[in-house]
Amino acid sequence: MKRILGIILFTALIISCFTVCKKSGIQKDYPFQPIPFTEVRITDQYWSARLETNQKVTISYAFQQCEETGRIQNFEEAAAVKSGKKERGTFSSVYPFDDSDVYKVIEGASYSLSVHPDPELEKYLDDLIAKIAAAQEDDGYLYTARTINSDPPVRWVEKERWGNMYLGHELYNAGHMYEAAVAHYLATGKRNFLDVALKNADLIASVFGPGKSHGAPGHQEIEIGLVKLYRVTRVRKYLNLAKFFLDERGNSTDRKLFGEYSQDHLPVIEQSEAVGHAVRAAYMYSGMADVAALTGDSSYIQAIDRIWEDVVQGKIYVTGGIGATGAGEAFGGDYNLPNATAYAETCAAIGNALWNQRMFLLHGDAKYIDVLERVLYNGLISGVALTGKLFFYTNPLESYGQHQRSPWFSCACCPSNISRFMPSVPGYVYAQRDDTLYVNLFIDSQVKVDLKGHQVNIQQETEYPWEGSVKITVDPEEPGEFAVFVRIPGWTQNQPIPSNLYQYLSRSEEKAVLKVNGEQTDFNLDKGYARIRRTWNKGDAVELDFPMPVRRVISHPEVKENIGKVALERGPLVYCAEWPDNQGNVSNLALPNGTELKAEHRENMFDSITVIKGQVQALHQGKNENETITTQQEFMAIPYYAWAHRGQGEMAVWLPRQESLARALPKPSIASTSQVSVSRDKNGSAVNDQWEPKNSNDHSHPYLHWWPTKGTMEWVQYDFKKPEIVSAVEVYWFDDTGRGECRVPVSWRALYRKNGEWIPVVNKGSYGVEKDTYNRVTFEPIQTTGLRLEIQLQEKFSAGIHEWKVHLYGVRLP
């Protein structure tokens, strides 16, 4: 009974935001309304497993990490200072925005409680919320990094409140608190967290606004949270404050602008391009959509329409990821979409999904769901391992073995974001407007909807994303006329994305087939939807068949990294080639246009997947460096989201279409077969991976670095498989001048192992520290089982190495 009452409360309050708003003081809202996730029961194998893992593993694991990393202790410390038990506390984590991770996991746990009652979890939340409430200052201020008053102070935290709007994250933390508090209230009916949030929001509303302090949050998020407070309370000042913060961006009358990084370079209604920090941007665009829907401000809609076009035209990865560069975690310029260095942050993927859902709710156009589906099945779900305990912060489209999922991060925004997003996935499946049901995603599910007085049970049966057959049973309690609009995905219409950024190499003549009660029905598309309006009776069924051939994708020619390359798709899934399936390497493979590719289902891989099989050309270096040997080789690709579950190695989404673009696999060398060890337990695998750098500042391939260590003596060591006679080494230095803090070293020397000791070699020349070239030193031949380089770093800088080669005595040097 308690579960039923909880679901009723959650559903009623969410639906009230859309269906009874005029009676409650809300005059406007989104014209298209999502069916709440609490109403949708997911029954398919693919999503059920992921949702269950999030519920049973990820949420509790994230709370555990918040405890172990001091995030929860921060609230306890702040409470101790506030109560007078301590004069100063100790900030126990790293960043002032760490409070937000706790809030996000609470939000995810609350969503989980809405559909999976758990008294133990509910009690844990009550205890945690009590700690948060105890940390709140008397006037509502809640920001542990300042209340703790730690010595030394936390980075970015100024002496006075709101003193560092650019990086302080006070308002960012508050926004996530509001979202979590609303979720908890809707799930449990308890006000213990909501009252904390409202007290804080009232304080902020008393400080900021017209005639008060003028400022824009450095990191957008509070706007979304304020809108959710408004929806629950109907208190207009929260909506007004959200709009105020948006309108303050680009307004230099009372303050210095933060610039493009924070989308603070222009007023939001004048912005047309996606620039700066990608997560900040996506949250801002989502907040603008919310405020536009609730206020009717068409200038907001016009702006985010322009920005959306800018993104899909040249700033989105084929996986749906956004934010190309790690410099500022930001959007790059048009068509700047590198693969190996792609940032594509998991939080940005989540933000992209949130934004595109809102764009659909504004416009009712399937193109937004096409983008949402792309990111959901590819660049977002890749951010969490199948186990639910390992995470990607960034989601590159190419790897040389330097990437692996992490159990947590010092900046843990992505794992906590995953924990709150996953339970909401069922809420993206269906939507409605008046008497029309929109079927947006194809997931085996059940839902009951009220279509303008028609009570209708919907059951969707499908093995999507592996198979394209979908059956939707429409079961009204009484016969009646209403409409069902079914999205026909863009990928079935030879359009992978709603622009010319990506295209299929060849058109498919296979078309989606629609049947109603077994009879094939012609359909015209209305904004990407097949429209079916009729008098429905119990047991009526809509059947769809989406052909799922393997498709080759090519990029716009301005995407320089993808020239001459192809990506593989099947249905909504983007595929990648990974080393375990392709004889240990991927970079030496070429996939000619005419190669036959076929899909093959594997029940025993990654909880059941469909792979792509075929033949490729494999390139290997011949007897000398200028000779290339090409052979035919079996090829297999797996869904992109499933990579990096079997250890570190090569992976690529984009594959060369001709041999000239593939890398001939070098012959093993004394260096490449050596065991590498490095001071400070650094991973040294990059120094002998045989990838040739373009220059010292090349970030496209792995490199060894000692940053943030500066001014010290460091070392890197090779242990040979057997004693070798060697007479020369070459080092290619990493130097990221203009981007980071690594420089060529002051000096270095080579040593060899003799009787367990390291002895300097007798060198015949100087030890070079030149950039953009190999620095070779020859020495008297020695027989040894290992070499070591000792490297003296510059006083205020770190250092790094791209490649370290070793030459055998008697072998002619190149």
Q: What residue ranges belong to the model's regions?
A:
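Aromatic (Trp/Tyr) and acidic
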Residues: 26-119, 123, 153-187, 220-237, ...
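Aromatic, loop-rich ligand-recognition surfaces of beta-strand-rich domains
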Residues: 662-663, 697-814
